[in-house]
């Protein structure tokens, strides 16, 4: 890396002098920044080579949501160096290194590092567990909602971008009473969630759309005469024997 400056000799002549920078990289006191300084001070037009700082994501974003939590770089070196590549390790710098193209996503501590001129700066941060929310789930109502004497169960699965959810228990309510979703009527669905690797536990989680209605069966009864089917008029009331069935029952 070269710099240039105008030099005036003893005779008053001016000429342009090229300067070869010799950059020294120094780690900041907080361990998060690297500063470049030219140590070849002879005829150096500017010894300041700038600095670069690695910074953790904003604290309010460090809650699991299925997205990457990348560290960022602030400021730039003026030495002609490319922006350093950020690498990530699990834990406080002693754990496994994440593969290229992978970033902190799941709950846990991570260390993000950059290296320039043999000097490494780093920052450690931690992703916290999230509280389960209805948006983390996909609700599907039962396929058949006509009464048939069988329980009607909804399907609730975690969203495709979500991992580390605890076991889910699905419950059905009419008003405030937990019931089996079998008879005709309106049902509200609630879930309880156990602790998971990325989520806290939750109870009675629901959404206004987590509901369905079982409709009563509508069918014509079948009426058949049974026993004696031949009668002689007597002027008296005659009551035949009949059998009434619905759907063969």
Residue map of PLM features:
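Solvent-exposed beta-strand/loop surfaces, strongest in extracytoplasmic domains of secreted
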Residues: 1-249
